[in-house]
């Protein structure tokens, strides 16, 4: 079994590059080397990612690919063989071009007809040659991130590449990228081995030695191991302080990206800063210093945890340095807080006219007025009665953008508006809605707790999506600068998770915008594990009610659990498929129902129709589907015993009209013809 090691040594990579490239390397290694693995195992591929290195160790590799039998297709058989059964010039040319002995040529039948061809055995490529050919190509396939050039090679990468290790077992596989030739040496920790600043240059004798060599050189090369070390230290210090950690996987990931040998150091700050809102202290620590906080009984304690990238000898000096920097930041925050409290949020409302929302969409004040119009309309549609409370909350919702605190820490928008409005005596629901109207900020974020906050959040997100799409600012697959996709997902989550029965067509007059939001609902439903065919069957009907669409998908998914699901779907699909697209519907004429099965089917249809519609109106889709299941045996008998496409036009159209009425019931839930099965 062979092992291959690739290490790309760089100047300090930014966290985004580390997080992106480690996932890319894993997928690349899996796809590229899949024909060389002796057996499939998670241990076949190990990824290493630190600020100074990206590496992949691939184990359990064969020396060469297995030989493969492949079929080569040549000219059509009638062109390749003449009437006497001899090979024509076309056949001989095909054989010569592909180095195929004439006796190997044979007739091959395909879907497109008969051809001359041959089945040959292709020699598997050697692992060494494969690596030499394939790995240099990898360097041009990294995902596009902000990059730079640093020499005359014209190669671009987020940071300069300083060394490349390429080892097949103990042999260097030679190639060159960005004027850097592959070798067997790596560099150990920049500050814990000599020379300081560069780190000891260390030869790797065998690919499998990589992890041990880096570990002895004060490098935890494996990202997850390093992250685990950081979390373990955080939890350990919390126990020592009789406190709790504050879960923040994003920050811990970032610290993991900034260190090769993380060493935690607990620092202190003055309790006077605890007069600041909790979120302010956490924001200062997280976004400006990458410090972690501790809490006890839900309240912060005046301690923080910083991580050094090496085991410093004099921790007190480093600790004092961390504390000094944080003290200055918190002092600024306290000053901003006190200054902001001297002013009323109301004074900022008019000043929003001076903040541009977008050059084609006016000022932030214009945005607030649009939000207000939408919020009042949504309130009318959803039954929220207090219009004055809505007006007050919406007008204050963006006022904190002009506070000193939010100017300095824009992550605190909404949060500071909540605290400042509380201080100036606003109703609690209004204050909370100022914060909540930004929720959810991500696909995993919390949603608003209050009805007012939900209303404001929905209005704000709808305005953003509607406004930007109307001016042609659609998100690109790789970029969403105005947060349109994120806001659309927020709309979906609010409507589904707050169970809001709202037809978006009552607030959206552009089908392309509704389609965009429905596409986000599709993604949301897929993320919840629902089957694609069920989602398509429901969403293809273009119902503008997001919550009802969700309930329909949920109910249909339960139907899939029936033992005879396949048979049920086959019958329901047949109803929809048999009706011609250009069929002109007319009411069923009971006098034209001549056979017993069609009379019984119509009678059962009439029996359940009104009850079915009540279930649909009440969003009870499980019971509605139950009624449709009651129709199935009658539909079965109808199809088994009644000829539909008869010569008598009146009889034929009457039977099609009956099926059309039944299919219209089905389409209150889904287009069953789009379901897979049956």
Curated annotation (Swiss-Prot):
Superkingdom of this protein's organism: Bacteria
Pfam family, one: tRNA_synt_2f
Major localization listed first in the record, in broad terms: cytoplasm
A GO term, aspect molecular function: arginine-tRNA ligase activity
InterPro entries: DALR_anticod-bd, Gly-tRNA-synth_bsu, Gly-tRNA-synth_heterodimer
One GO cellular component term: cytosol
Enzyme class: ligase
Annotated compartments: Cytoplasm
Protein known as: Glycine--tRNA ligase beta subunit
Originating species: Sulfurihydrogenibium sp. (strain YO3AOP1)
Taxon lineage: Bacteria, Pseudomonadati, Aquificota, Aquificia, Aquificales
């Amino acid at each position: 079994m062979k092992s291959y090691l690739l290490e790309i040594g760089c100047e300090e990579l930014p966290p985004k590059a580390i997080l992106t490239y480690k996932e890319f390397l894993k997928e690349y290694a899996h796809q590229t080397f899949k024909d060389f693995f002796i057996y499939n195992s998670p241990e076949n591929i190990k990824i290493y990612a630190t600020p100074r290195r990206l590496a992949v160790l691939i184990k359990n590799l064969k020396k060469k690919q297995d030989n493969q039998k492949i079929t080569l297709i040549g000219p059509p058989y009638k062109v390749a063989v003449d009437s006497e059964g001899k090979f024509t010039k076309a056949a001989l040319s095909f054989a010569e071009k592909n180095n195929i002995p004439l006796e190997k040529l044979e007739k091959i039948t395909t879907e497109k007809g008969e051809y001359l061809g041959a089945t040959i055995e292709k020699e598997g490529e050697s692992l060494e040659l494969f690596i030499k050919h394939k790995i240099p190509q990898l360097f041009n396939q990294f995902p596009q991130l902000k990059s730079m050039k640093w020499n005359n090679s014209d190669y671009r990468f987020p940071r300069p590449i300083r060394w490349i290790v390429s080892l097949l077992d103990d042999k260097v596989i030679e190639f060159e990228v960005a004027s850097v030739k592959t070798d067997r040496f790596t560099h150990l920790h920049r500050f814990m081995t000599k020379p300081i600043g560069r780190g000891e240059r260390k030869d790797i004798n065998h690919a499998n030695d990589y992890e041990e060599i880096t570990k002895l050189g004060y490098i935890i090369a494996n990202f997850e191991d390093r992250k685990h070390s950081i979390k373990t230290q955080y939890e350990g210090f919390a126990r020592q302080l009789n406190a709790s950690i504050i879960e923040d996987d994003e920050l811990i990931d970032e610290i993991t990206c900034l260190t090769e040998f993380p060493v935690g150091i607990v620092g202190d700050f003055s309790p006077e800063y605890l007069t600041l809102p909790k979120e302010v202290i956490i924001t200062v620590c997280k976004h400006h210093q990458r410090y972690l906080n501790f809490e006890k009984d839900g309240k912060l304690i005046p301690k923080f945890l910083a991580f050094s990238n090496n085991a410093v000898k004099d921790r007190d000096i480093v600790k004092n340095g961390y504390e000094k920097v944080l003290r200055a930041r918190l002092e600024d925050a306290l000053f901003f807080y006190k200054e902001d409290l001297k002013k009323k949020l109301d004074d900022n409302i008019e000043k929003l006219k001076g903040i541009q929302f977008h050059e084609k969409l006016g000022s932030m004040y214009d945005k607030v007025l649009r939000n207000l119009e939408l919020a009042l309309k949504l309130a009318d549609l959803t039954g929220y009665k207090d219009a004055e409370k809505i007006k007050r909350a919406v007008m204050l919702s963006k006022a904190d953008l002009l506070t000193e605190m939010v100017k300095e820490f824009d992550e605190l928008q909404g949060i500071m508006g909540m605290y400042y409005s509380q201080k100036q005596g606003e109703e609690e629901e209004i204050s909370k809605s100022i914060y909540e109207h930004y929720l959810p900020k991500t696909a995993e974020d919390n949603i608003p707790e209050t009805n007012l906050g939900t209303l404001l959040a929905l209005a704000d997100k709808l305005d953003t999506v509607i406004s930007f799409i109307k001016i042609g600012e659609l998100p690109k697959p790789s970029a969403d600068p105005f947060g349109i996709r994120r806001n659309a997902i927020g709309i979906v989550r609010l409507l589904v998770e707050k169970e809001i029965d709202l037809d978006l067509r009552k607030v959206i007059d552009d089908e392309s915008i509704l389609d965009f939001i429905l596409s986000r609902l599709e993604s949301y439903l897929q993320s919840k594990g629902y089957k694609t065919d069920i989602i398509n069957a429901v969403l293809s009907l273009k119902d503008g009610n997001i919550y009802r669409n969700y309930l329909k998908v949920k109910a249909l998914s339960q139907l899939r659990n029936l033992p005879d699901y396949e048979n049920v779907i086959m019958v329901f699909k047949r109803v929809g498929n048999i009706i011609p697209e250009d069929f002109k519907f007319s009411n069923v004429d009971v006098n034209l129902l001549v056979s017993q099965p069609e009379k019984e089917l119509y009678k059962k249809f009439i029996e359940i129709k009104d009850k079915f519609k009540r279930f649909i109106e009440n969003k009870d889709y499980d019971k509605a589907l139950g009624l449709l299941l009651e129709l199935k045996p009658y539909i079965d008998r109808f199809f088994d015993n009644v000829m539909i496409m008869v010569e008598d036009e009146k009889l034929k159209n009457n039977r099609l009209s009956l099926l059309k009425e039944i299919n219209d019931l089905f389409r209150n839930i889904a287009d069953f013809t789009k379901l897979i099965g049956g």
